[in-house]
Amino acid sequence: SFQEIAYTVADAFFGEDVDAESLKKIVYDTLQFDVPLVNVNDNIYSLELFHGPTLAFKDVGARFMSRLLGYFIKKQGLKEINVLVATSGDSGSAVANGFLGVEGIHVYVLYPKGKVSKIQECQFTTLGKNITALEIDGTFDDCQALVKSAFMDADLNKHLKLTSANSINVARFLPQAFYYFYAYAQLKKA
């Protein structure tokens, strides 16, 4: 199954830092939707990555990261960390949905005013709880610059315990490797 393959890959990446039972729970909780491999034509296949809760391929990475971060918060006895993400759509939706309700984590989604689809804007502005959406009068690059400047501010980082949910965070992009191993395994069966 996708979950079994993903667990094996995750164990290779994180096995020394996360106990087996917790890692398995993180992986299985992350992957609660199908990622079918579809034969498009002859020897051409497509892995459909739009079956997650926000219909974005980033759902896997965001959901995995949220659960992994939640695990480390508990393990290290931290009270709260703050996640910053700049978005023009997909990242904000996937991160907001993936982190919704995760204890000890507050997410701030920065997005450019009028430059995000209405559907995606609704996906991260209507959740409440531990998700705060901040509409920025500017471009995606302006949002990204604000996030980067927050990380450059040592006092702010110390006080708020900041991390990023953009693709610079290894916990967000490494789970995308699950796709390749799963697709290869499915092709071997075909």
Question: What are the language-model segments listed below?
Answer:
Residues S1-A190:
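PLP-dependent amino-acid enzyme catalytic core
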